[in-house]
């Protein structure tokens, strides 16, 4: 009997502290015998990683940026995510489409209707039920005030073009995440990221346990 795959994404503005908890959750799933695929967006495949470098570092308009992100996502889905889910893996992805709506949409002001069209087109999966659009089974959103995120990023490693944006940009991005959660609340677990690391981890763990995926 094949174990059903699970797709979990992790979202939040830069500085929210996702990475530590992604690794911890991977360990928790593996401890219960599950195969785990760790990945990220943009990226996850050789082609998508090349596009990631362009998106994070090169100057371009919002449309070019969005198209590159969705091109990377299509390759990521076809080459990595869908095969992993078909094997029954737990796929843990650092950012997915919600980030595109938050960063390119709310942050950069790109047309949300076009993003919705790209989401439907790029994330439709052949062979599954009609009109199926691949999105995570659970999205863990690390909600952090923009000003606190800016403090965390100050003096860190050399920032990419998004990390170097002003606080107001991250306020818009946070609003974009809130709008996505409001549109699909059952998919989201909102985590207060301005807590101790252990408190944040407990909230993440409880969100996954509530779905019956960990004991």
Swiss-Prot record:
It holds the Pfam family Thymidylate_kin. CDD domains: TMPK (cd01672). One of its GO terms (molecular function) is ATP binding. One of its GO terms (cellular component) is cytosol. One of its GO terms (biological process) is dTDP biosynthetic process. Keywords: ATP-binding, Kinase, Nucleotide biosynthesis, Nucleotide-binding, Transferase. Its EC number is 2.7.4.9. It catalyses: dTMP + ATP = dTDP + ADP. Belongs to the thymidylate kinase family. NCBIfam families: DTMP_kinase (TIGR00041). Phosphorylation of dTMP to form dTDP in both de novo and salvage pathways of dTTP synthesis. This is Thymidylate kinase. It comes from Albidiferax ferrireducens (strain ATCC BAA-621 / DSM 15236 / T118) (Rhodoferax ferrireducens). The gene is tmk.
